[in-house]
Amino acid sequence: MLDNYLTLENAQFEIRYVEGEHRFAQEALGILSTALPSITSYFLLSNPFPKVRAVLVTHRNEFDRLVRDLLRVEIEVPSHPARLAQPQRTDMVVLSPSAYASHSIFTYIPAQFRRLLIHELVHMVEEQLTPDMEASPRWWSEGLAVYLSEQWRYEDEFRKAALDGIAQNNIPGFRQIEAERTLAYDWGWTIVWFVESAYGRHMIVRVVKECADGNVFSVLGETATSLETRWRNWILAEGRLTSQSRVGLRET
């Protein structure tokens, strides 16, 4: 399945790539190797993390093929040009930045590529820790990945909807966020941030490790209504989303 791919690896990561992509393979290896210790430390992970394989592809068709055949994940064909990566267990398929112009809606920006890979690595660590990844609400998993990768801090794709919603006093309820995919990305990270602020990092870790049925609120000792009220009041605090002080991964 990967017969024509070259390999660049260290003890923790294996990057598979095609000829001409060595630059991006090196970049990916460096990003992942630097990020994993920070992520595992955040989640208080003491056991060694399994070796991770990332496959860089240069065409949308190859991306779809490997997501389907290597990862065994159902995917629309052709997949949406906004889709750049897909993790599953300890494998991830990533559209190479060299293919962005032809096969995506994005322009390659090194810092955004870094945050994308960290986002996917957070999903991988969560999957290793959680009792049932499929039961985890999308807003929680995506919120966690957007928050810890700090995409929310720098990228309008993740940040603008929340900022605009707050400015216009148009904040969705939890039921809407749970029901709509785009809202999970737009607002999930704000809920994760609130949980970390209100309960501490240990509660984030506890939710990931204990939430087997998808009921995040139960682990928190809250109802959806009570948490939504507290979150809404918190998020409306003056300057909340523009604050640059937080505990988590650091921009480098």
Describe every region a protein language model picked out.
Residues 2-133, 137, 215-219:
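Juxtacatalytic substrate-recognition/specificity segment
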Residues 83-90, 112-116, 124, 128-252:
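Acidic/His/Gly-enriched intrinsically disordered linker/tail segments
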